[in-house]
A protein has these predicted regions:
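N-terminal interaction/assembly modules
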Residues: 1-138
Length: 138
């Protein structure tokens, strides 16, 4: 498995763990243990994304709300909301990853697992977050 494939899988695992937590309320350690018992590797990058997105959830939801025209994070389906949380966290706290990669991975995850228009919403919100980030750093 290449580094990119490993990071793609780690992002998807983080989204799934956050989604499961949102829906079930189970603690992350229990969800991680269940994943590992099922033979899924929960590596360092998955844990970093999961921890960061869960600890900064309110802040990330505020960023999402600010970038989403006519939407709030609370109104979104749990899967879309958690794809955005992971991606926004990575955009803001993992500058070593190119913005285009973060956005493309989030859009691909939405295309694979969400409804037919979810990827457009996610692309638009992440594009707005990236533009805002560029404006504040220049």
């Amino acid at each position: 498995m290449t580094r990119e494939e490993g990071r793609r899988a780690a992002r998807r695992r983080a989204v799934i763990l956050l989604y499961q937590h949102d829906v079930t309320g189970l603690p992350f350690e229990e969800l991680i243990e269940n994943s590992e018992c099922a033979g899924e590797e929960v590596g360092e990058f998955t844990r970093a994304l999961t921890d960061g997105a869960s600890l900064d959830r309110e802040y990330l939801d505020g960023v999402i709300d600010g970038a989403a025209e006519g939407w709030t994070a609370k109104r979104m389906a749990p899967l879309e909301r958690n794809i955005l949380r992971v991606a926004v966290h990575e955009l803001l706290d993992h500058p070593e990853t190119p913005e285009a990669v973060v956005i493309a991975e989030a859009v691909a995850t939405a295309q694979r697992f969400c409804g037919p228009d979810a990827h457009r919403l996610i692309n638009g919100i992440l594009g707005a977050v990236a533009r805002e980030r560029e404006e504040t750093t220049t």
